[in-house]
């Protein structure tokens, strides 16, 4: 049927003759038929269709020939190879030898064919197309128009099929290189683009040939300047196209470009511009190989960022005197301008090149601050606005990079970027203030962007400069010529600066600041209004930072702020963002100024409650009441309290999890502050709702619900009815919860407080509760035994319960638990297990020495044949000792000396003692310390790894208590002939590192290298321990190791490499098994790199790590691949330019990972593991896809294309990208 319709359409073409409209309609009908999925075609129709469409391409009516071109796209997909080759030949003939007026159409048609042909047909088409295009480019007498068309078509061809035409690469490259010397600028420009597109698929030899030829052209000093400029552009384009592969050619190209920069004539600005652009490409795409030239490039950018030979700046230094303002504005307006002056291009290129160096060389930040920062600040006065924006952006890059690499570090070191930045703050503010007085809105927006980034990096740096900045903020908000963008930027900065500085700093300027901000609240544009309301929130805190008097009279500002916000709060016809900001801000106003707004509260509070009825503003209103309830002013809520509690109780039933969490927090604050004003009936309803929220499936919600229960029980209004409701509704849920192995963290702490409150405040029988808790440990027929982790939770609740019930009840419970141990000795019952853990938990909190022989009873459980019982006994003994060190520590030490067979268990008991003491900072007696150290050092060489690990942890925690004794003792043993001893002492150092500042830090700092340099030890166990220690230092105390990293990093990277000598084959009879003894070491090394990238980026040179080490890891064992995917994602986020430079080399291992399919007979575990691996790789690919400039990599684009063609893979990728 479709063929009959097409035949009818073809007959129309023969009948239409000279009538253009008929020809148009016939072509349109044909296009519609070709686009139908049901359209099928036979050989005869192929010939007729292709002939008619090619004929229509020559139609004198442009709209008809345009439709004919569109017909080619679906036609190419539906005709055979022979027909496509025939059409390609005819189109080439039209392009090369046809009439001039048909050339454009033929070119577009050819590009359409190239875009649509299937990859399987591409080789046949290329055999026909490529020689003719090469002929069109190089042929004698060919016009520049034909050359340009051929170059554009070849550009499309090599971009899509470059890897399929390797046989033509050399001939095509030679042809293109000759065109770089063409007299026509358009031909040269398109040649540069074509060579760059071809470059990514060229072999290394041909790439070298291209580079050598271009450098040779540049060496010809007699060449025309425009030819030289083209060749410089070619160098930059090649580098951008091939990335890290260009690195080997930098030795030949960088000196030539620097020479052109410095020796170009004064009028040849474009030569300098292109040279600097090429150098920027080198910095971003070849960060590893450009390293030797970075200092020289830095000096070059600093020279040319102020290059302005036609203009002399004789203006005197800026002052902050406001009387000069008008004069300066006039000066700005009448600045030197010259349409022929192109020096601004050089300055812009220099600024961008400097930005490239800043973002790619984090290790040079200190040098950049010392040499470039003052120059950049000086260039804020740049007279060309576009260049000024680039200078601002470069400085913002510097600030952001400072924030990235100094995250979590102190700024006391005089060589640290943050410290150096602090020294420049005054100059920055002075220069920015001048920019804020400029007339240009764009300039002022850029200036505020710089200030905003400055405050993000150095939150408290503007305290001494607020007075000079306020006029600029006022002008930005008050000036009628100000745009919304400028107002938003000024408001965002104001909010940041108010939030990050001490309130008294702003008190002299509150009047000047508040007026324009409150005016902005009334703006029509919602984004300005929302931002102004956020500023008001910060302003409220600044105006009255505490209810105690601070010598500042805040009262004049209360009603203006309240009125401005109230007008927005009551206006329903506005954007959701404004509504939410108004609610949040009003919550702060009432919380802070409530005592001054008593007359207004009865009209304001009902509006906030009303906003809780609207689903859009409900969550924000709930949070606002939490702020009001925590106010030290104890705001009178009587007019809305009952309604408020009823609304909140209803929200506990809502499906919205975030709303339920916010509701629990708000209810807790309300019950704490207004508990005696809330009726017990309301509490009983609340408790019913709370019971349904206590579940192991949501521990955060559970913790909040339990906290509210405790508040209800401990409040003044706790009645017998409330206690009964808690026992009947909540207690059963709590007893179910305590049996879960997943219970941990805040939920476990709140559960302990819940049991404590039950005994203290809710008149609950201690023995009933205790029996209920102990019963939780009994195995049930349905669920079997209670998990080990649950027993620990139950034991902690038992201990808290006993202490809350008083000494008498506590003592009787301890006796009962001891009886259980006597009666059940030799069994593996949960009852005995729980008894041991409970004694440990009680003993840790209370001295149990009054119970004679308790230690002997506990230690008898060491004889148990069951490991769980022995472990629990060890835990119990150590914790009981914590309750009375002088009584029990000598006993444990004596037992370790005399009980050889029980040493491992006893060492765990000692570990419990030491770990608890290191946290509580309790001191041991000297005699005990000496005895403990002697004992621990004696066990350093134990054959059992478990013993050595316990010893290392004990030594590490002892170092926190006695650093002066431990650090030298550990250091001495780093040179021990026994490898196990060396490994144990470096592991001990790892355990001594904690997040909080310690006296140990200053003692270990000078000695730290002797421990970490064991990374080059001959024994792999020692190396692994050193790597693990380095990782821990990098995470918690990066400042201690920064100075060692230049020496440590190459050694660390070496540990990521597969070592053949560590791979062995074990003969298992029927089959052989390969064992890789270096796997755990490599895993530890990659984990350490991940930590270093996160905490010490300014010391890590990512370029030297990614290739070859990360690339190798992406092809290593399953566990290491997953780690490397994480590292790659982190690097893509923190230093994208370094990743972009070597991206092509990373695509293949990622492609292999996502394409891998397990064998058909693989077990489910292998399939699951492979799915995890694919998802891990897709996350890394998603991170790479977000890098700006990733489109330069044809290989990565190919990877994304392959993924799109695989529907299941693309769906997984989209899911991950949307997470």
Curated annotation (Swiss-Prot):
Q: Name one GO cellular component term.
A: plasma membrane
**The keyword Transcription regulation is annotated on this UniProt entry:** yes
What does the UniProt keyword field contain?
Answer: Acetylation, Repeat, Transcription, Transcription regulation, Ubl conjugation pathway
Deletion phenotype, per the entry, is: Developmental phenotypes such as dwarfism, organ defects, short inflorescences and mishaped leaves. Low fertility and reduced responses to hormones.
Q: Does the keyword Transcription apply?
A: yes
InterPro entries in the record: ARM-like, ARM-type_fold, CAND1/CAND2, TATA-bd_TIP120
Enumerate the residue ranges of region (Disordered): 311-340
**Among the record's GO biological process terms, what is one?**
vegetative to reproductive phase transition of meristem
Where, by tissue, is this protein expressed? Highly expressed in roots. Expressed in stems, flowers and siliques.
Give the sites modified to N-acetylalanine.
2
Q: Acidic residues: which segments have biased composition? A: 314-340
Repeat region (HEAT), residues: 44-81, 83-119, 209-244, 248-288, 327-363, 367-404, 423-460, 464-503, 599-636, 639-676, 808-848, 850-883, 927-964, 966-998, 1002-1039, 1043-1079, 1101-1137, 1141-1180
Q: Which family does it belong to?
A: Belongs to the CAND family.
Q: How does it assemble?
A: Interacts with CUL1 and CUL4. Binds unneddylated CUL1, but cannot bind CUL1 once it has been neddylated.
Protein function: Key assembly factor of SCF (SKP1-CUL1-F-box protein) E3 ubiquitin ligase complexes that promotes the exchange of the substrate-recognition F-box subunit in SCF complexes, thereby playing a key role in the cellular repertoire of SCF complexes. Acts as a F-box protein exchange factor. Required for SCF(TIR1) function. Modulates SCF(TIR1) function through its interactions with the CUL1 subunit. Represses photomorphogenesis by promoting HY5 degradation in darkness.
Name listed for the protein in its UniProt record: Cullin-associated NEDD8-dissociated protein 1
The gene designation is CAND1
């Amino acid at each position: 049927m479709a063929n009959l319709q097409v035949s009818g359409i073809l007959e129309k073409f023969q009948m239409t003759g000279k009538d253009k409209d008929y020809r148009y309609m016939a072509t349109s009908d044909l296009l519609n038929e070709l686009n139908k999925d049901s359209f099928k075609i036979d050989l005869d129709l192929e010939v007729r269709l292709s002939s008619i469409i090619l004929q229509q391409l020559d139609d004198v009516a442009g709209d008809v020939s345009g439709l004919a071109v569109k017909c080619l796209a679906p036609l190419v997909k539906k005709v055979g190879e022979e027909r496509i080759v025939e059409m390609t030949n005819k189109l080439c003939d039209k392009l090369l030898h046809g009439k001039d007026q048909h050339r454009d159409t033929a070119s577009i048609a050819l590009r359409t064919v190239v875009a649509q042909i299937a990859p399987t047909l591409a080789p046949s088409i290329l055999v026909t197309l490529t020689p003719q295009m090469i002929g069109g480019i190089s042929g004698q007498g060919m016009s520049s128009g034909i050359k340009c068309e051929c170059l554009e078509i070849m550009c499309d061809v090599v971009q899509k099929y470059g890897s399929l035409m390797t046989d033509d690469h050399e001939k095509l490259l030679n042809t293109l290189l000759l065109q770089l010397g063409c007299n026509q600028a358009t031909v040269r420009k398109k040649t540069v683009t074509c060579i760059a597109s071809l470059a990514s698929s060229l072999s290394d030899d041909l790439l070298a040939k291209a580079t050598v030829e271009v450098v040779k052209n540049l060496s010809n000093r007699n060449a025309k300047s425009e030819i030289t400029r083209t060749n410089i552009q070619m160098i930059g384009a090649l580098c951008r196209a091939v990335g890290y592969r260009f690195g080997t050619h930098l030795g030949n190209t960088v000196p030539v470009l620097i020479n052109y920069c410095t020796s170009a004539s004064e009028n040849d600005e474009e030569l300098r511009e292109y040279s600097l652009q090429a150098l920027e490409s080198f910095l971003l795409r070849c960060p590893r190989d450009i390293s030797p030239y970075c200092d020289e490039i830095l000096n070059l950018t600093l020279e040319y960022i102020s290059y302005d030979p036609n203009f002399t700046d004789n203006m005197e230094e800026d002052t902050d005197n406001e009387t000069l303002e008008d004069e300066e504005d006039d000066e700005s307006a009448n600045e030197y301008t010259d349409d022929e002056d192109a020096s601004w291009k050089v300055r812009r290129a220099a600024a961008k090149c400097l930005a490239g160096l800043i973002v790619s060389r984090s290790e040079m930040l200190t040098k950049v601050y010392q040499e470039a920062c003052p120059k950049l600040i000086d260039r804020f006065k740049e007279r060309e606005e576009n260049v000024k924006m680039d200078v601002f952006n470069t400085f913002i890059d510097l600030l952001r990079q400072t924030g990235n690499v100094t995250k979590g570090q102190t700024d006391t070191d005089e060589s640290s970027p943050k410290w150096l930045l602090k020294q420049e703050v005054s100059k920055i503010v002075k220069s920015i203030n001048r920019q804020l007085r400029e007339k240009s809105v764009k300039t002022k927006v850029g200036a505020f962007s710089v200030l905003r980034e400055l405050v993000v990096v150095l939150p408290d740096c503007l305290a001494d400069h607020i007075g000079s900045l306020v006029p600029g903020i006022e002008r930005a908000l008050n000036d009628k010529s100000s745009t919304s963008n400028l107002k938003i930027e000024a408001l965002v900065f104001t909010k940041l600066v108010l939030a990050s500085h001490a309130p008294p700093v702003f008190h002299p300027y509150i009047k000047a600041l508040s007026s324009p901000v409150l005016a902005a609240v009334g703006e029509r544009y919602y984004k300005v209004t929302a931002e102004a309301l956020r500023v008001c929130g910060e302003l409220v805190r600044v105006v009255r930072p505490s209810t105690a008097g601070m010598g500042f009279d805040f009262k004049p500002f209360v009603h203006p702020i309240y009125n401005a916000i109230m007008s927005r709060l009551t206006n329903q016809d506005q954007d959701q963002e404004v509504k939410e900001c108004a609610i949040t801000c009003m919550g702060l106003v009432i919380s802070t100024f409530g005592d001054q707004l008593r007359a207004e509260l009865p009209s304001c509070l009902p509006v906030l409650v009303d906003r809780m009825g609207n689903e859009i503003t409900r969550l924000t209103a709930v949070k606002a009441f939490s702020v009001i309830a925590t106010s030290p002013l104890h705001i009178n809520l009587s007019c809305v309290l009952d309604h408020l509690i009823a609304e909140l109780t209803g929200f506990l039933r809502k499906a919205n999890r975030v709303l339920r969490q916010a509701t629990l927090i708000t209810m807790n604050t309300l019950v704490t502050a207004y508990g005696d004003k809330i009726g017990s009936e309301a509490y009983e309803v609340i408790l019913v709702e709370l019971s349904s929220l206590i579940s192991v499936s949501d521990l955060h919600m559970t913790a909040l619900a339990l906290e509210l229960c405790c508040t209800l029980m401990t409040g003044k209004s706790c009645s017998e009815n409330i206690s009964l409701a808690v026992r009947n509704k909540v207690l059963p849920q709590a007893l179910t919860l305590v049996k879960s192995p997943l219970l941990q963290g805040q939920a476990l702490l709140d559960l302990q407080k819940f049991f404590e409150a039950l005994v203290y405040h809710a008149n609950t029988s201690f023995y009933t509760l205790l029996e209920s808790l102990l019963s939780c440990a009994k195995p049930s027929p349905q669920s079997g035994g209670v998990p080990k982790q649950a027993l620990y939770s139950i034991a902690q609740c038992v201990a808290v319960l006993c202490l809350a019930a008083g000494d008498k009840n506590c003592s009787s419970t301890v006796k009962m638990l001891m009886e259980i141990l006597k009666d059940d000795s030799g069994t593996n019952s949960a009852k005995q297990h729980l008894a041991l853990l409970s004694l440990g938990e009680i003993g840790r909190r209370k001295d149990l020495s009054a119970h004679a022989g308790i230690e002997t009873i506990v230690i008898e459980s060491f004889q148990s044949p069951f490991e769980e019982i022995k472990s629990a006994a060890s835990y119990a003994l150590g914790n009981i000792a914590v309750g009375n060190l002088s009584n029990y520590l000598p006993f444990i030490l004596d037992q370790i000396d005399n009980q050889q067979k029980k040493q491992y268990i006893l060492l765990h008991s000692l570990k419990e003692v030491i770990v608890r003491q290191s946290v509580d900072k309790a001191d041991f007696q000297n005699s005990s310390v000496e005895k403990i150290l002697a004992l621990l050092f004696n066990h350093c060489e134990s054959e059992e790894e478990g013993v050595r690990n316990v010893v290392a942890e004990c030594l590490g925690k002892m170092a926190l208590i006695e650093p002066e004794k431990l650090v030298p003792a550990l250091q001495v043993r780093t040179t021990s002939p026994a490898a196990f001893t060396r490994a144990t002492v470096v592991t001990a150092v790892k355990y001594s590192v904690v997040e909080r500042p310690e006296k140990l830090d200053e003692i270990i700092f000078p000695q730290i290298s002797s421990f970490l340099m064991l990374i080059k030890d001959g024994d792999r166990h020692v190396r692994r321990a050193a790597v693990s220690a380095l990782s821990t230092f990098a995470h918690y105390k990066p400042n201690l190791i920064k100075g060692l990293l230049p020496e440590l990093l190459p050694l660390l990277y070496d540990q990521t490499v597969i070592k053949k000598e560590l791979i062995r084959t074990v003969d298992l009879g029927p089959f052989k098994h390969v064992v890789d003894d270096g796997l755990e070491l490599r895993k530890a090394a990659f984990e350490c790199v991940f930590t270093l990238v996160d905490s010490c980026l300014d010391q890590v040179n990512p370029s030297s790590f990614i290739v070859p080490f990360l690339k190798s890891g992406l092809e290593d064992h399953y566990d290491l691949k997953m780690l490397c995917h994480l590292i790659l994602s982190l690097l893509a986020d923190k230093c994208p330019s370094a990743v972009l430079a070597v991206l092509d080399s990373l695509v293949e291992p990622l492609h292999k990972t996502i394409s891998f399919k397990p064998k058909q007979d693989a077990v489910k575990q292998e399939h699951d593991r492979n799915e995890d691996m694919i998802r891990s790789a897709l996350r890394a690919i998603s991170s790479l896809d977000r890098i700006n400039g990733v489109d330069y990599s044809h290989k990565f684009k190919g990877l994304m294309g392959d993924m799109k063609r695989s529907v299941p893979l693309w769906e997984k990728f989209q899911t991950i990208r949307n997470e």
